[in-house]
């Protein structure tokens, strides 16, 4: 049976490819989804890839993932730095969560240096461009095997 990984994306990630390409690169979220699904096939994983600009929807998806998946990769966007709700949703589920970011958030503005969700996650990957998603999938495959 193929294991499922949820890949969740937060606010403004639907704007990838248009939004600050000097920071985030030229790939769209659809491009990243295709890359994740291809990597998933190579790893024997089923990838459930989603994006929402709404915090409550992301919380609901964490709850759903706990029933349907073996792990979650999350690029929470700006919610990384503000969301106690996402922190609590991650703590509430029994499967591992990996936080990821396209850019190196620690080399950017001071307000991006603190993650509200990192303490609830198994690990954090950032700064490798869109490849951060693939690294997160490899990490989840390794810790759920």
Swiss-Prot record:
Active site: residue positions: 24, 101
UniProt site positions, description: Transition state stabilizer: 19
Record keywords: Amino-acid biosynthesis, Aromatic amino acid biosynthesis, Lyase
Gene3D superfamilies according to UniProt: Dehydroquinase, class II (3.40.50.9100)
Enzyme Commission identifier(s): 4.2.1.10
Binding site for substrate: 75, 81, 88, 102-103, 112
CDD domains: DHQase_II
Catalytic activity: 3-dehydroquinate = 3-dehydroshikimate + H2O
Keyword Amino-acid biosynthesis among UniProt keywords: yes
Single Gene Ontology BP annotation: chorismate biosynthetic process
Enzyme kind, highest EC tier: lyase
Pathway assignment: Metabolic intermediate biosynthesis; chorismate biosynthesis; chorismate from D-erythrose 4-phosphate and phosphoenolpyruvate: step 3/7
InterPro entries documented for this protein: DHquinase_II, DHquinase_II_CS, DHquinase_II_sf
An annotated Gene Ontology molecular function: 3-dehydroquinate dehydratase activity
Summary of the function given for this chain in its UniProt record: Catalyzes a trans-dehydration via an enolate intermediate.
Quaternary structure (record): Homododecamer.
Protein family: Belongs to the type-II 3-dehydroquinase family.
Name of the molecule in the record: 3-dehydroquinate dehydratase
Organism: Rhizobium johnstonii (strain DSM 114642 / LMG 32736 / 3841)
């Amino acid at each position: 049976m193929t294991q499922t990984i949820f890949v969740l994306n937060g606010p403004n990630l639907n704007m990838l490819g248009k939004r600050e390409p000097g920071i985030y690169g030229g790939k769209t979220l659809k491009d990243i989804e295709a890359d994740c699904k291809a990597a998933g096939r190579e790893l024997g994983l089923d990838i459930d890839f989603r994006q929402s600009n709404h915090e409550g929807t992301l919380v609901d998806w964490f709850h759903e993932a706990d029933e349907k998946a073996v792990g979650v990769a999350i690029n929470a966007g700006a919610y990384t730095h503000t969301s106690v709700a996402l922190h609590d949703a991650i703590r509430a589920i029994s499967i591992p969560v990996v936080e990821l970011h396209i850019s190196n958030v620690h080399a950017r503005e001071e307000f991006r240096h603190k993650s509200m969700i990192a303490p609830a996650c198994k690990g954090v990957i950032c700064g490798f461009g869109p490849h951060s998603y693939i690294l997160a999938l490899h990490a989840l495959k390794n810790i759920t095997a």
